[in-house]
C-alpha cells in the first residue's frame, strides 16, 4: 500500500477533463488499497471525503479556455502544510507546470514525483514560461502524458522521456 498525494492545479468542484481524471484515478487507487489524498483548489464543499481543499479558484484565461486555478500565496501555504502534515510515498502532479499547487509541490520535492501532462496542441504558457517550466520539469522523477499529442507538446518545450498512459 502506498500513500499517494494527487495534486491538481484546477478546482475539483468545477467540471473538467483533468479534474475528472484526478478524482477517477484517486477512487480507483483507493479501491485497490492505496491511501490517496487529492490536494486541489475547491470552490465550495469537497466533492469527495479524500479531497483536501486548498482554497477557492480564480477563473484564469489559458490556451483558449478559462481554467479554475489557485495561483495565490494562501493556496501555496495550504499545499505546503498538507504535504508536510502527511508522509506521502509518492506525489502525483497533474499538469505539473501550471501555476499553483502543482508547482508548489514540485518545488518542495518531498517524495518521488510523477508529473502527468494533459495539455495538447500548442500552449502559449509553455512558450512564455519555457526556461522556468524546463527547470521545474527537471525535478520530476517520472513524466507521463495522457496522449501522443500531450507528449509532443511537453517534449517540444520540456525535453525528457515520457510514458503515455491514456486517460481511463
What are these regions (language model features)?
Residues 14, 66-71, 92-93, 119-125:
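Short, flexible loop segments at the rims of nucleotide/cofactor-binding pockets, characterized by
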Residues 61-90, 100, 128-135:
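An amphipathic, basic-hydrophobic alpha-helix
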Residues 42, 149, 168:
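Carbohydrate-associated surface elements
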Residues 2, 8-15, 22-73, 81-82:
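N-terminal strand-loop element at the rim of the active site
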Residues 4, 90-92, 97, 103-123, ...:
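Active-site proximal beta-strand in glycosyltransferases
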Residues 121-145, 150-152, 157:
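Membrane-proximal helix-turn-helix segments that form the acceptor-binding/catalytic region
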Amino acid at each position: 500500500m502506498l500513500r499517494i498525494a494527487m495534486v491538481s492545479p484546477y478546482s475539483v468542484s468545477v467540471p473538467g477533463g483533468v479534474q475528472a481524471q484526478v478524482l477517477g484515478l484517486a477512487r480507483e487507487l483507493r479501491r485497490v488499497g492505496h491511501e490517496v489524498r487529492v490536494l486541489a483548489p475547491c470552490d465550495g464543499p469537497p466533492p469527495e471525503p479524500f479531497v483536501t481543499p486548498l482554497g477557492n479558484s480564480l477563473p484564469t484565461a489559458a490556451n483558449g479556455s478559462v481554467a479554475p486555478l489557485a495561483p495565490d500565496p494562501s493556496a501555496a501555504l495550504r499545499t505546503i502544510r498538507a504535504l508536510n502534515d502527511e508522509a506521502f510515498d509518492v506525489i502525483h502532479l497533474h499538469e505539473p507546470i501550471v501555476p499553483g499547487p502543482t508547482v508548489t509541490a514540485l518545488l518542495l520535492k518531498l517524495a518521488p514525483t510523477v508529473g502527468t501532462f494533459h495539455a495538447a496542441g500548442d500552449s502559449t504558457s509553455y512558450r512564455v514560461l519555457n526556461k522556468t517550466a524546463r527547470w521545474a520539469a527537471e525535478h520530476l522523477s517520472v513524466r507521463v502524458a495522457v496522449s501522443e499529442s500531450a507528449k509532443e507538446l511537453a517534449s517540444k518545450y520540456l525535453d525528457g522521456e515520457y510514458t503515455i498512459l491514456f486517460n481511463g
